[in-house]
C-alpha cells in the first residue's frame, strides 16, 4: 500500500524521470530544441530512454498500448454519452434518416449550426455511422447507451491506471516476460482473436439477431424485450419457431431463417447484408483463427531457406510492427470498399453522408498505416538487423547469407529499376492521355479525344473481374437471380434511394485507374527505396552509422541531402496523400454520378445526384477542376449564414493551415536562422529575454512541421468540402 501511494501523486506524474528520457530530455526545456526533441523522441523508447534494455522497452511498449486503449475507451464513451443524452436515436430507430447527436450551445450565434433533423429535433448531422452500428448491436434505448458510456469510462480509467502502473512500477519477472517478443506469439494472438470473434458472433446470434428481427417486422422499439429476456427459451421460440431443440438444430434454424447465411443479397427492410450472414461470418472467422493459431503453435518451422529470417523478425519490435501496420492498413482499405459495395450496417447504404465519411476515414487510416510500415521497416534495417556476409553488426546480431533480407538487398538495384520503369511508364501514359484530351478539346477537336463517344479505351479486364461473383453463383442460382442477388449487382433501393447498383465502367474509369496505379507505385517506390537503401547507398556507404534521420550526409560528398530513411518516409507521406486524394475524389464523383440517387417508381428510372456526368467530364484535367472541384464546392463556399457554415469556416481555416506549411517546405534553414536571430536581437534590445532560449529549426524539424501542417490542412479542406456537399444533398 505504501508503494501504491508513493507513485500516485501529481509530483511523480509530472516528473520526466531519468529512467523514461535520456539526460538531455530529463533536464527539461532549456531551449526550444527540447520541444522538438520531445516530439521526435518521446516514444522512441530504444533511443530516448537512459534505460533501454529489452525488458524496459517491452514494459514501455506494453504501457503505451494500454494508454492507447484508454484513449479509445474514452472516445467510445464520448460517442455513447452524446448518443445517450444529446441525440435523436430513439426517434431515428422509428425513422432512420437523419441522425444527430451534437447539440451546439448558443454563445455568439453558434446555434445556427443546429439543423432541423425532423421530429422537432435540432442538432448537427452526424456521419460517424454509430447509429447504424448501435442498431446492428441490438441497442434500442438510450438507457443502454448510458450503460455503455459508463462501461467505456470505467475501461478508460482502468487501462490508464494499468498503463501508468506498468510504466512506473515493475517486477523483474514481469519485465522478463515483456522483454521477450515470444510473449506476443502470433499463434496465441490468433487464438485470442478467434475467441473474440466467436464471442461477438454469440452476441449477434443471441441478442442482436432477435432484436433486429423484431425491428424489421415493425415492432415499436419501446415495446421490445430487454436483452436479458432473450436468454429465456420461451421468447426465442416465439421469434424463431422450432428453437430450443439442440445446438445443431438451433444453429441451422438461424442459418435457414430468411436473412441468414443461405440467403443472398441485401435485407429489403434495412438495405444491408442480413445479420445472420454477419454472425456466421464471425463464427467461421473465429474457428479459422483458432485452428490457424493451434497449427502455428504446434508446427515447428524448418531452419532452411527463407525461415532463416525467423530470428531477426521474432526479436525485433520494428519488424513485427511493420508487418502488422501493413496488414492493418490493407484491411482498413478493404473495409472502406466494403462499406459501399456490401453495406453491413442497417440503413447505412442509403445514408450517403455516412458512407462517404466511413470510406474516406478508413482510406486515410490505411494510407498512414502503410507509410508507417515503411518507416518501421527502415528502422528495423538500421537498428535490429546485422550486416551482409555474416559479419557481426554493432548490435551483435548476424546476417544470414541465404535470408530473404539478404536476397532483397542483393537485388535491390534490379527491384528499384523495375519499380522506376513501371512508375515512369504509368505516369507518362496516364497523364499523357489526360493532356491529349485537354489539348484536343481546347483546339475544338472532340472527335479525336479518348472518350466513350470517340476513341474508346474499354477496361475489359475490370469488367471481367466485376462479373466474377455473378459467374461464380450461376451454378446455384438461375436467371437474373445470379446477378441481382449479389450486393453491387442489379439495383437495390431503400425508401426510394439507391443503395447499390452495377457501376458502368468506361473510358473515364480506365484513365483514372491508371492514375491510381501510377500514384500507388510511386508511393511504393519511395518507401521501398527508403527501406532497401537505409543501410548504405552508392553515394553514402556508411548510412548505417548515421541512423534513421539526419538532414545531410556531411561535407566532402557533394552535399547529398534528403537521403535518410526519415526523408523517404517524409516524401512517402506526400505521395500517399496524392494517392488517396485521387481515390476519394474519384469515389465521391463516381458515386454521385453513377450510383447515388432517387429511384422514380413511375418512370422506373434513377435520377442520379449529378446526372451521370462522370464519364463525360472526368476525361480531362479541366473537367476535374471545373465540374468536380469548383462546381461541387458551391455548397461549402456558399455555406455562410446556414447550418453548414461550420464547414465553410473549416474550409477556410484548413486552407490557411495548408498554405502555412509551404513556408516550412519551401524555405531553407538559413531563413529560420535569420528570423530567430532577428527576433532574439529585438528581445535583448528591449531587455525581454525568455527563460527558454529560442533556437532556429533544423532542416529535419522544419520539414516535419511543414509535413504536419500540409496533412492537417489538406485533410481538413477535403473533409469540409465533402461533408458540406453531401449533407446539403442529403437534407435537401
UniProtKB/Swiss-Prot annotation:
Spans through the membrane: 61-84, 145-168, 185-209, 278-296, 317-340, 356-382, 414-436, 510-528, 568-589, 644-666, 704-724
A GO term for molecular function: oxidoreductase activity
UniProt xrefs under InterPro entries: PSI_PsaA (IPR006243), PSI_PsaA/B (IPR001280), PSI_PsaA/B_CS (IPR020586), PSI_PsaA/B_sf (IPR036408)
One GO BP: photosynthesis
EC assignment: 1.97.1.12
Residue numbers binding phylloquinone: 672
List of residues binding chlorophyll a': 655
Superkingdom of the source species: Eukaryota
Signal peptide residues on this chain, from the entry's feature table: none
Keywords associated with the record: 4Fe-4S, Chlorophyll, Chloroplast, Chromophore, Electron transport, Iron, Iron-sulfur, Magnesium, Membrane, Metal-binding, Oxidoreductase, Photosynthesis, Photosystem I, Plastid, Thylakoid, Transmembrane, Transmembrane helix, Transport
Topology with respect to the bilayer: Multi-pass membrane protein
Free-text remark on how the cofactor is bound: P700 is a chlorophyll a/chlorophyll a' dimer, A0 is one or more chlorophyll a, A1 is one or both phylloquinones and FX is a shared 4Fe-4S iron-sulfur center.
Protein localization: Plastid, Chloroplast thylakoid membrane
Record's catalysed reaction(s): reduced [plastocyanin] + hnu + oxidized [2Fe-2S]-[ferredoxin] = oxidized [plastocyanin] + reduced [2Fe-2S]-[ferredoxin]
Top EC category: oxidoreductase
Residues holding chlorophyll a: 663, 671
PROSITE patterns recorded: PHOTOSYSTEM_I_PSAAB
A GO-annotated cellular component: photosystem I
Binding site for [4Fe-4S] cluster: 552, 561
Record-stated family: Belongs to the PsaA/PsaB family.
Subunit: The PsaA/B heterodimer binds the P700 chlorophyll special pair and subsequent electron acceptors. PSI consists of a core antenna complex that captures photons, and an electron transfer chain that converts photonic excitation into a charge separation. The eukaryotic PSI reaction center is composed of at least 11 subunits.
HAMAP family listed in its UniProt record: PSI_PsaA
Functional note: PsaA and PsaB bind P700, the primary electron donor of photosystem I (PSI), as well as the electron acceptors A0, A1 and FX. PSI is a plastocyanin/cytochrome c6-ferredoxin oxidoreductase, converting photonic excitation into a charge separation, which transfers an electron from the donor P700 chlorophyll pair to the spectroscopically characterized acceptors A0, A1, FX, FA and FB in turn. Oxidized P700 is reduced on the lumenal side of the thylakoid membrane by plastocyanin or cytochrome c6.
Name assigned to this protein: Photosystem I P700 chlorophyll a apoprotein A1
Amino acid at each position: 500500500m505504501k508503494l501504491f501511494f508513493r507513485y500516485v501523486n501529481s509530483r511523480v506524474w509530472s516528473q520526466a524521470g531519468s529512467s523514461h528520457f535520456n539526460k538531455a530530455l530529463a533536464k527539461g526545456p532549456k531551449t526550444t530544441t527540447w520541444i522538438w526533441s520531445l516530439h521526435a523522441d518521446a516514444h522512441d523508447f530504444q533511443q530516448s530512454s537512459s534505460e533501454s534494455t529489452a525488458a524496459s522497452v517491452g514494459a514501455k511498449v506494453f504501457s503505451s498500448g494500454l494508454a492507447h486503449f484508454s484513449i479509445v475507451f474514452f472516445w467510445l464513451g464520448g460517442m455513447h454519452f452524446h448518443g445517450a443524452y444529446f441525440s435523436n436515436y430513439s426517434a431515428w430507430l422509428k425513422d432512420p434518416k437523419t441522425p444527430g447527436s451534437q447539440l451546439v450551445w448558443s454563445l455568439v450565434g453558434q446555434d445556427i449550426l443546429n439543423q432541423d433533423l425532423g421530429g422537432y429535433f435540432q442538432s448537427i448531422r452526424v456521419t460517424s455511422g454509430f447509429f447504424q452500428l448501435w442498431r446492428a448491436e441490438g441497442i434500442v434505448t438510450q438507457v443502454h447507451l448510458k450503460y455503455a458510456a459508463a462501461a467505456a469510462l470505467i475501461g478508460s480509467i482502468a487501462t490508464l491506471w494499468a498503463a501508468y502502473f506498468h510504466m512506473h512500477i515493475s517486477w523483474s519477472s514481469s519485465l522478463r516476460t515483456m522483454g521477450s517478443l515470444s510473449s506476443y506469439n502470433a499463434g496465441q494472438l490468433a487464438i485470442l482473436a478467434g475467441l473474440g470473434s466467436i464471442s461477438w458472433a454469440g452476441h449477434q446470434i443471441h441478442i442482436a439477431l432477435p432484436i433486429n428481427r423484431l425491428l424489421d417486422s415493425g415492432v415499436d422499439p419501446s415495446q421490445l424485450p430487454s436483452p436479458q429476456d432473450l436468454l429465456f427459451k420461451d421468447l426465442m421460440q416465439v421469434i424463431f419457431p422450432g428453437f430450443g431443440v439442440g445446438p445443431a438444430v438451433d444453429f441451422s434454424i438461424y442459418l435457414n431463417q430468411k436473412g441468414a447465411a443461405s440467403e443472398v443479397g441485401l435485407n429489403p427492410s434495412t438495405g444491408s447484408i442480413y445479420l445472420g450472414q454477419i454472425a456466421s461470418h464471425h463464427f467461421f472467422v473465429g474457428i479459422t483463427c483458432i485452428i490457424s493459431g493451434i497449427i502455428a503453435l504446434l508446427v515447428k518451422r524448418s531452419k532452411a531457406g527463407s525461415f532463416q529470417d525467423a530470428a531477426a523478425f521474432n526479436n525485433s519490435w520494428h519488424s513485427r510492427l511493420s508487418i502488422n501496420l501493413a496488414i492493418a492498413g490493407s484491411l482498413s482499405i478493404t473495409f472502406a470498399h466494403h462499406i459501399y459495395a456490401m453495406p453491413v450496417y442497417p440503413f447505412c447504404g442509403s445514408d450517403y453522408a455516412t458512407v462517404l465519411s466511413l470510406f474516406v476515414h478508413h482510406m486515410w487510416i490505411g494510407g498512414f498505416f502503410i507509410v508507417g510500415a515503411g518507416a518501421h521497416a527502415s528502422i528495423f534495417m538500421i537498428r535490429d538487423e546485422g550486416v551482409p556476409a555474416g559479419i557481426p553488426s554493432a548490435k551483435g546480431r548476424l546476417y544470414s547469407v541465404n535470408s530473404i533480407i539478404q536476397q532483397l538487398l542483393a537485388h535491390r538495384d534490379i527491384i528499384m529499376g523495375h519499380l522506376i520503369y513501371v512508375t515512369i511508364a504509368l505516369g507518362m501514359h496516364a497523364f499523357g492521355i489526360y493532356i491529349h484530351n485537354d489539348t484536343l478539346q481546347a483546339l475544338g477537336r472532340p472527335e479525336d479525344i479518348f472518350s466513350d463517344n470517340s476513341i474508346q479505351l474499354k477496361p475489359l479486364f475490370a469488367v471481367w473481374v466485376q462479373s466474377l461473383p455473378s459467374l461464380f453463383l450461376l451454378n446455384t442460382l438461375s436467371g437474373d437471380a445470379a446477378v441481382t442477388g449479389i450486393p453491387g449487382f442489379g439495383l437495390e433501393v431503400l425508401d426510394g434511394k439507391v443503395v447499390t447498383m452495377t457501376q458502368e465502367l468506361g473510358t473515364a474509369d480506365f484513365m483514372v485507374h491508371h492514375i491510381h496505379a501510377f500514384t500507388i507505385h510511386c508511393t511504393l517506390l519511395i518507401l521501398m527505396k527508403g527501406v532497401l537503401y537505409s543501410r548504405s547507398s552508392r553515394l553514402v556507404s556508411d548510412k548505417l552509422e548515421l541512423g534513421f534521420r539526419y538532414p545531410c550526409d556531411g561535407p566532402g560528398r557533394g552535399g547529398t541531402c534528403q537521403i535518410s530513411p526519415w526523408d523517404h518516409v517524409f516524401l512517402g507521406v506526400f505521395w500517399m496523400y496524392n494517392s488517396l486524394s485521387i481515390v476519394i475524389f474519384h469515389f465521391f464523383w463516381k458515386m454521385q454520378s453513377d450510383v447515388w440517387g432517387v429511384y422514380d417508381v413511375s418512370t422506373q428510372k434513377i435520377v442520379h445526384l449529378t446526372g451521370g456526368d462522370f464519364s463525360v467530364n472526368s476525361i480531362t484535367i479541366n473537367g476535374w477542376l471545373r465540374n468536380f472541384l469548383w462546381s461541387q464546392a458551391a455548397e461549402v463556399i456558399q455555406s455562410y449564414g446556414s447550418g453548414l457554415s461550420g464547414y465553410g469556416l473549416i474550409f477556410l481555416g484548413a486552407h490557411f493551415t495548408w498554405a502555412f506549411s509551404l513556408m516550412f517546405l519551401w524555405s531553407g534553414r538559413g531563413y529560420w536562422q535569420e528570423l530567430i536571430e532577428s527576433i532574439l536581437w529585438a528581445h535583448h534590445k528591449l531587455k525581454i529575454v525568455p527563460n527558454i532560449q529560442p533556437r532556429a529549426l533544423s532542416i529535419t524539424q522544419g520539414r516535419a512541421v511543414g509535413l504536419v501542417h500540409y496533412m492537417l490542412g489538406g485533410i481538413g479542406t477535403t473533409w469540409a468540402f465533402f461533408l458540406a456537399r453531401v449533407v446539403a444533398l442529403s437534407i435537401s
